[in-house]
């Protein structure tokens, strides 16, 4: 929840969910 994964999730979901990232406030975060 704190580390930005450098990916947005405004129109498409996070591809980086495979790396443990999740969508928050239209940006993908890890932890």
From Swiss-Prot:
<keyword id="KW-0611">Plant defense</keyword>
<dbReference type="Pfam" id="PF03784">
    <property type="entry name" value="Cyclotide"/>
</dbReference>
<keyword id="KW-0929">Antimicrobial</keyword>
<dbReference type="GO" id="GO:0042742">
    <property type="term" value="P:defense response to bacterium"/>
</dbReference>
<comment type="similarity">
    <text>Belongs to the cyclotide family. Bracelet subfamily.</text>
</comment>
<keyword id="KW-0960">Knottin</keyword>
<dbReference type="InterPro" id="IPR036146">
    <property type="entry name" value="Cyclotide_sf"/>
</dbReference>
<keyword id="KW-0044">Antibiotic</keyword>
<feature type="disulfide bond">
    <location>
        <begin position="5"/>
        <end position="21"/>
    </location>
</feature>
<comment type="function">
    <text>Probably participates in a plant defense mechanism. Has antibiotic activity. Inhibits the cytopathic effects and replication of the human immunodeficiency virus. Active against both Gram-positive and Gram-negative bacteria.</text>
</comment>
<feature type="disulfide bond">
    <location>
        <begin position="9"/>
        <end position="23"/>
    </location>
</feature>
<protein>
    <recommendedName>
        <fullName>Circulin-B</fullName>
    </recommendedName>
</protein>
<feature type="disulfide bond">
    <location>
        <begin position="14"/>
        <end position="28"/>
    </location>
</feature>
<dbReference type="InterPro" id="IPR012323">
    <property type="entry name" value="Cyclotide_bracelet_CS"/>
</dbReference>
<dbReference type="InterPro" id="IPR005535">
    <property type="entry name" value="Cyclotide"/>
</dbReference>
<feature type="cross-link" description="Cyclopeptide (Gly-Asn)">
    <location>
        <begin position="1"/>
        <end position="31"/>
    </location>
</feature>
<keyword id="KW-1015">Disulfide bond</keyword>
